[in-house]
């Protein structure tokens, strides 16, 4: 009887344990969760996922929030706000964000058009 009960508990416990470890990295990475949300056009979910990381100063999260504002994905399009987020990411050395700041200066979106500033970034 004890052996049968132990076997039954093991049959339930082991698959559950394996499932936990398979799904843990997915749930544990808010950055990736934000990317998946973007792919599904769930922009508010992406914003929530990246906001927490942005508070921690994660450059790519700061940049991605800037992208949401630049494109108007899930928020009102706001180039000034996008510039703010891009500059925060750029200040942490993220080349992609530096490029984005330069592009906004080049196009005059959210700031006065300034070719010298565009080249600087």
For each feature predicted by the language model, list its residue ranges.
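N-terminal secretory signal peptides that target proteins for export/translocation
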Residues: 1-8
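Bacterial N-terminal signal peptides
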Residues: 13-22
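Sec/Tat signal peptide C-region and signal peptidase I cleavage site
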Residues: 24-28
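Hydrophobic face of amphipathic alpha-helices that form TPR/SEL1-like repeat modules
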Residues: 30-37, 49-53, 62-71, 98-107
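Short helix-capping/linker turns of helical repeat alpha-solenoids
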Residues: 42, 55-58, 71-73, 78, ...
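Short, intrinsically disordered, charge-balanced linker/junction segments flanking boundaries
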Residues: 113-121
